[in-house]
Amino acid sequence: WNGPDELELEISSTDGVGHIRARNQLHKGFSWGPYKGNFTGSSSSPGPADLNISPSWDVDGDCWLKYVTLVSCEAEANAVLYRKGDLIWCKTSQIVEQDEVIQAFLKAEPQAIPNYTIKEEPGETSQCTSTLPEFQLLPQQAGMAAILATAVVNKDVFPCKDCGIWYRSERNLQAHLMYYCASRQSSTSPSMEEKAKDSYPNERICPFPQCKKSCPSTSSLEIHMRSHSGERPFVCLICLSAFTTKANCERHLKVHTDTLNGVCHGCGFISTTRDILYSHLVTNHMICQPGSKVDVYPVVKAVPAVKSSNPVVSQIASSSLLKCGLCGFLAEDFQVFNHALLHTTNPVPSATHSVKSPPENINEKQNPESQENGNAKSPISSSSSASSRSEETPLKLYIKQEPEGQLSISEAGSTTCEAKDGVALVQSPAIKVKTEMSSPTPGSSPVPNETGAATGGGTVIIPHYVFGHEATAAIVPQASEILAKMSELVHSRLKQGQAVTPAGFSGSAVPKGATCFECEITFNNINNYYVHKRLYCSGRHVSDENSSSARKVKALPARTALASGFSSTEQEASPPQEDAGEESSAPVVAVKLEENSGMDCEGAGSGHVSEGSQSPSSLDDPEEDPNRTVCGACNIRFSRHETYVVHKRYYCASRHDPPLRRREVNKPGPPYTTQPTPRTRKRRKLYEIHGVAPTESTPPSPHTLGRVEAMALMPGLIPAPVMPSPSSSPDAVDGPIDLSKKPRLVAEAPVPSAAATVAPLADYHECTACRISFNSLESYLAHKKFSCPTAPLQQKTIQQLQKVKSPSSATGKLVDDTVKVKVESKAALSPGSVSDTIQPLALPFSTISDPKQLQQYSSVTEASLSATTTCPYCPHNVIIRGDLLEHFRSVHGLILAKPTAGHRLQTTIMEVLVPARGQTSSASENSLPSPPVSSASPLQLPGLRRENSNYKDTTSSSSSVNGSPILTSTPRPLLPTSPAPPSNSLPLAESRREDGLPRVPSQVLLPGDKAMQPPKPSLISPVPNGNHRYCRLCNIKFSSLSTFIAHKKYYCSSHAAEHVK
């Protein structure tokens, strides 16, 4: 005998005719071949008339196919002989029992027979290679295939026929078949192979001859026997679903709960914890009745005397009480009916239509497909036959049906039977009903249906070395380590997408574990997949309309994407004015622009923000969008929206970048181009900050002064352009911050109204020496250039001081060493009276040397000054209403000395005494009367020292060796030199005399706040002899050179220009 090992040749002794019999049971689709040969006659299949003649086979003389018995009817045959070209194949068309004769039917090519695994004959390898699809083996597979023929069969490895998994222990195989096998829910799965000789003492074998399943314990055998008997003792009282095990019923009960809100759908019970909710479900909505079958539940006994409208209620004989058929609750009349509503929600016919439970084995033999994992598809499937015998209307149970597209692989169809009066059973179309949750197996994991994929399990077969279901036969064990390794390599190649399954495979590739296609993550463990889908999947918040469609990745708007270094294609632009036809070749994901994120103008406050607030990009991309997980600025994709929100709020690179200017919707013009990239922070040296050449400043014209509403009381006399506030002009903060030292020319904008408040981010630019914050960079640079005491005097200012001091010191007409800055209301003084009192004075940092210019300027200022004024210590866009002195006292803590007798003080007039920086002679000082000073007076302050080393040539007589000035008998008060940005004002300087007598200073503005005290750099002169361990700006002397270098590198106030949060 040279045929397959599964077959044997039997030659009759009487007539000498040979027959082919099966040694073992063969499955449907078992194949042998190919064999070189052809049928007798034409290329088409021979007809029935040709079968009367003994066919001749064009095959080898010793081929076993010529002994196969041929039949004329396909229904009588258990095998099929067909050909493909010049090759002949033999395949079983149904299950062939042991010792059964092979009867074949001739066919040209089978169309309805599934393409199962074929077995390759050892002598026909070359022929098989030329016909089967080519599959290039990996080097490891080729080496293993070479030694496969001589490999020793490992009999201690136990394979699973349906899953293609080999186990080293039979106990592991049994556990796999009971809990994890993909085909464990199918009642038509092939029978297991015979048990090994050595059996374990605690194992139990199923007594059914067609099953012979081995169970590790008695309890597991009892549970397994329920699949044969149809017993379902665990019942869900909400939907009346029955289950074989308690775990399956408890898992089903979770469907009737809202775990997010903790609400039970059955009775409305609300719980704060999930454990209490599950305990409530098991206690109140699940019962266990041993011996319950798959009848329509609950069982109702017919009581002729009582016709109840509720099937779960029955009447007890010789009593007026009614009993609930579910829980045994006893009550009278309608109390039981109201109680029964807790168990059933769908209407069921009356109790007169009784149901008698038929034998369950008959039902199961007729409809074996109605069982899955021992659980009935619907209770009506088993009781329909009993209803038909009693010739009564069957009970109709409304079953919740799922859409066909959303059913899982494990959900199979079940048939429902309906009977009419006197009519036999008519089988209705199969419907798919909702059953218990399938087991977490790779075969039932939610994977997308691909083209050519089969729903059942199967093994991945290499065409050159085909190993089918016969590999698990008892006499041909194919469970070596070589085959296991080759199968593992094939699985890994298919998983990585490096190969495509040929058409000759016996089944589709079953992926290992499960894949989340929304997050593009593959899990080896199915439990990890379930945890991911429940807690971490990005599709948890996606709405229903988005879940069915393809996943659309949303990114940042195009302008942010361009700023980040990549471009994107605007596929769905909401504004019709946008050019949607532009295409980009950059390899990025398509961007879907939301309708509410159009190209509208940015509102106020869209500039830089502080640490705790939202970033600029979060204003454009609201965090409320639960679908956004891509950060375009950092080019990072997050799996969860919560992680994306935390990243955008605390870690995103766009938090400190200014938002790019948004293009107007209705603004015509060329396409939008990105702004230049802001310069990074650079460590600047001292000469870079203060080494700016002074610009020529001219007095403002009366036309320019006519637009000024308030004048700042500061000594700097340079007119700065009016800076728009962030609230009035969003374009001012739209572009990148320019940290250059040159003030930009900005178009004039109307001064904000009196109701304007302090703009946000007022501490963005801060002068560390003066402790003053500025809203704009121009105001900060103007302060550092002209008003900051740490800035050195410019050459032009020194020359002007010398010119002004020389005539004053020669004539001795300098009456007072202070400058009176006077601010009056419009009706207080006329321009003429003011012009008579103007005298040339020595003003610090003054650029006006002509008294006529000052006279002209002061007259225009007083004429245009209103009741509202500005504070030198507040931001430039804040206008003070009312008394400025009261504002100084309440807001800034500045104290005013009481006026002397005979001084007239009006509510609209304020005089501020500013000490002249260039004192000429001590004789003029001694000739002036001084106010009385007590020992505790705050006028005796060390703030009377010289402010700058540039005065060393003019104050050499009043300075000591260490740089401290010699205090005179009358200390002079000092005004805090911390001006506000000189944006729209010029100081008004005036010297006033009354009755030809020198005026005694009556009002002195004292520094009451620490922030308003004179800066430290003006206290000590630099150390002589060129000592480089002394910081002139910070007025700190260091003992070591290393400490001095560290101070200049990290802590010096010269880095004030870089003070950007």
From Swiss-Prot:
Residues 349-393, 435-455, 561-586, 599-630, 661-681, 917-1021 are annotated as: Disordered. Residues 736-742 are annotated as: Interaction with CTBP. A zinc finger (C2H2-type) spans 204-228, 234-256, 262-285, 869-892. A zinc finger (CCHC FOG-type) spans 152-185, 508-541, 623-656, 759-792, 1023-1056. Zn(2+) 3 binds at residues 631, 634, 647, 652. Its main location: nucleus. InterPro entries: FOG, ZF_CCHC_FOG, ZFPM1/2_PR, Znf_C2H2_sf, Znf_C2H2_type. GO terms for molecular function: DNA binding; RNA polymerase II-specific DNA-binding transcription factor binding; zinc ion binding. Zn(2+) 2 binds at residues 516, 519, 532, 537. PANTHER family: FRIEND OF GATA2-RELATED, ZINC FINGER PROTEIN ZFPM1. This is Zinc finger protein ZFPM1. The gene is zfpm1.
